[in-house]
Amino acid sequence: MKEIKLNSDSLEIYEKSVSEKLNRNDFIKLWDLDLNDLLDISYNLKKLFNKEKIDLCSIMNAKSGICPENCIFCSQSKHNTSKIDTYGLKSKEEILKNAKSVEKYSNRFSIVVSGKTVTDLEFEKIIESIEEIQNKTKLRVCVSLGLLNKDKLKALKERNVRIHNNLETSENYFKNICTSHDYSEKIKVILEAKKIGLEMCSGGIFGMGETIEDRVDLFLDLKKLGVDSVALNLLNPIYGTKIYEKIKSGDISPINSTDALKSICIARIALPNKVIRLCGGREHVLKDMQKYSLLALDGLMIGNYLTTNGQNIQSDLKMIEEMGFER
């Protein structure tokens, strides 16, 4: 990438971001800036802290559907009526095969399961899969296993695994998307994981009817929690989910590409030294503007998502190369 010079106002924001002198109101006011200015600031922050690289990760839906939780955005919730494949925990052979299929492209591989948490037997089998991947590939392993207790977190720490647990949105807005568990339960797990010394990935979803204030509050919570990686998703409303109906009826407006890019940039400015990763929904929301998100990002999730298809991996690799970034 060529050097992008900042105008005086943008330079001031950049410098205050680096020195952590921006407050909640400052982040909210960024929404009124021109998108190009936000992208310029974001790229300079990315270059300062995380250079010109785009880290790639992949996930596998290792246990799908019949989730007892009532998240209105999730096609795997039994409270929604989306038509998806449902199955129990995949075998370690199937999980290893999936990991090997993306090893050529990806640096990280995450085992994701549906449900509020995992049983002891499921956890034992997942540990076996983790060890298989670590022994037979060069991939770094992540897991998204719901609300885990201290013993399970310690077992994952012993195996140098990164934990993923999305906050999804702000504490204030969370009750609008889920009532079967609450925000504080997620915070408790993240704090316990950090206390044990686990690497932590957390983030949220844009486009569920939340305000820019909610998004900023999410970023500030992630900052306070000291997460290592921030996973950002853009809502791709799936037929059969409660949120699909809310968007169809006009109760919630779908997020557009400009709003999505601005939100990604504000995340970068609020969390300048964290790994910012864009995951699900980017193809649906950003379309041909995806490439501009790379100016603010350190990572992309590639391949398929939990119950929806992702962009062709070769297209992602070409996009990264054309924007002048390395992987």
Curated annotation (Swiss-Prot):
[2Fe-2S] cluster binds at residues 110, 142, 201, 277. [4Fe-4S] cluster binds at residues 67, 71, 74. Residues 49-282 form the Radical SAM core domain. GO terms for molecular function: 2 iron, 2 sulfur cluster binding; 4 iron, 4 sulfur cluster binding; biotin synthase activity; iron ion binding. Pfam families: BATS, Radical_SAM. Its cofactor is [4Fe-4S] cluster; [2Fe-2S] cluster. Keywords: 2Fe-2S, 4Fe-4S, Biotin biosynthesis, Iron, Iron-sulfur, Metal-binding, S-adenosyl-L-methionine, Transferase. Pathway: Cofactor biosynthesis; biotin biosynthesis; biotin from 7,8-diaminononanoate: step 2/2. Its EC number is 2.8.1.6. It catalyses: (4R,5S)-dethiobiotin + (sulfur carrier)-SH + 2 reduced [2Fe-2S]-[ferredoxin] + 2 S-adenosyl-L-methionine = (sulfur carrier)-H + biotin + 2 5'-deoxyadenosine + 2 L-methionine + 2 oxidized [2Fe-2S]-[ferredoxin]. One of its GO terms (biological process) is biotin biosynthetic process. Homodimer. Catalyzes the conversion of dethiobiotin (DTB) to biotin by the insertion of a sulfur atom into dethiobiotin via a radical-based mechanism. Belongs to the radical SAM superfamily. Biotin synthase family. This is Biotin synthase.
